[in-house]
């Protein structure tokens, strides 16, 4: 064999090796997503992921969010297919940890060191199963399962709703109030409209609704009349086709909580309830020189709550309170100025843990529901009740002491 023939044979073998390597690479990169994913979906709607491969070589499946990987697993295909179960739980844990309700995600497959983007999609947090159309739901509903609720003059309420990129939403407030000497004290409707602005991305918009703001809508048309002459009966909030109504009760509820609901947004829960305080002490006893001494003492307190009558709708809504991973004890708001709006944040309020509950919901006519639950503060150190120390408290030195016994 001549030298030229040897060179040609060598080049032919090199070409075959290169061609074989390129063929193997092409085969390795043949990865396809067989599951259909919507561009926008609730977390509970994320299906099991099925990825088809052209061979049985290993494939790494990754889920990315905000330029970092939150899930990564190496799989070996069976029958040229990889199936990932319950990816929705990974997404929900991530959203809960970030205290957010909506994020963009990217699903990737990595084979032979090369990454292939299989899908990009947006997820909105929802723990419970949802079978309707997500677009229609978001256009017609705030992120709550209630259409209305009782509120009080000291309450700060939150409403959240979805705004698509490029959309412009207008919020309209309607207050039903009576003013003495105006129309004979008959209820009238006062309105305010504000624009939420536009954004280049999908977002969850938060509305902060207070009795003080609603009172401000009425005070101007009331022509300087004192607040005692103004009675607010209810106020409603409208954003597009969405609507929510707050009915005002004069007295403050004995127990007020904020909790992250099924959509992972804070919602206020005012309860007419009786609370039983149960302090206890966990400690050990040591005996030294025949003298007993306490040590390792830990003071704790549990609170047992029994609510008054609840409608079926209220009881089903409060069920989300028991499922919630983040429950806060509402603190008193002292400042309602415009400068403080947005700073009243339940995230900075004392966290509580609902350790036990009894919730049996029925829909019998003429009979209301009642739920019981037990909670304790996440910080095991007990709290000092200071409301009675206030100089403005109505129980201090406002009535004479009368030692009357039966």
Predicted regions located by residue number:
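Preference for solvent-exposed, low-hydrophobicity sequence contexts
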Residues: 1-253
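Extracellular/virion structural assembly segments
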Residues: 2-6, 30-39, 162, 217-227, ...
């Amino acid at each position: 064999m001549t030298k030229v023939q040897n060179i040609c044979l060598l080049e032919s073998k090199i070409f075959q090796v290169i061609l074989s390597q390129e063929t193997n690479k092409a085969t390795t990169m043949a990865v396809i997503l067989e599951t259909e994913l919507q561009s926008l979906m609730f977390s509970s709607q994320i299906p099991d992921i099925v990825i088809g491969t052209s061979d049985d070589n290993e494939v790494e499946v990754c889920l990315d969010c905000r330029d970092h990987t939150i899930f990564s697993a190496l799989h070996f295909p069976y029958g040229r297919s990889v199936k990932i179960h319950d990816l929705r739980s990974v997404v929900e844990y991530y959203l809960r940890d970030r205290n957010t309700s909506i994020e963009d995600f990217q699903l990737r497959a990595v084979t032979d060191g090369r990454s292939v983007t299989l899908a990009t999609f947006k997820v909105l947090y929802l723990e419970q199963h949802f079978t309707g159309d997500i677009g229609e739901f978001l256009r017609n509903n705030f992120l709550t399962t209630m259409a209305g609720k009782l509120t009080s003059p000291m309450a700060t309420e939150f409403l959240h709703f979805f705004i698509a990129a490029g959309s412009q939403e207008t919020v309209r407030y309607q207050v039903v109030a009576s003013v003495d000497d105006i129309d004979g004290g008959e209820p009238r409707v006062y309105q305010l409209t504000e624009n939420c602005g536009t954004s280049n991305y999908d977002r969850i918009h938060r509305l902060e609704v207070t009795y003080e703001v609603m009172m401000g809508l009425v005070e101007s048309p009331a022509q300087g009349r004192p607040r005692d002459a103004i009675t607010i009966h209810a106020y409603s909030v409208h954003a597009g086709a969405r609507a929510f109504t707050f009915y005002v009760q004069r007295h403050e509820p004995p127990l007020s909580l904020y909790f992250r609901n099924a959509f992972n947004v804070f919602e206020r829960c005012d309860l007419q309830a009786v609370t039983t305080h149960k302090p206890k002490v966990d400690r050990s006893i040591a005996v030294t020189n025949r003298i007993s001494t306490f040590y390792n003492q830990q003071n704790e307190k549990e609170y047992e709550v029994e609510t008054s009558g609840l409608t079926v709708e209220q009881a089903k809504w409060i069920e989300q309170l028991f499922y919630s991973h983040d429950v806060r004890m509402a603190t008193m708001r002292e400042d309602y100025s415009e400068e403080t709006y947005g700073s009243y944040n339940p995230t900075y309020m004392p966290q509580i843990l609902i350790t036990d509950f009894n919730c049996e919901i029925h829909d019998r006519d003429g009979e209301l529901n009642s739920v019981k639950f037990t909670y304790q503060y996440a910080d095991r150190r007990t709290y000092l009740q200071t409301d009675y120390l206030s100089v403005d408290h109505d129980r201090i030195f406002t009535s004479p002491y009368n030692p009357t016994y039966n």
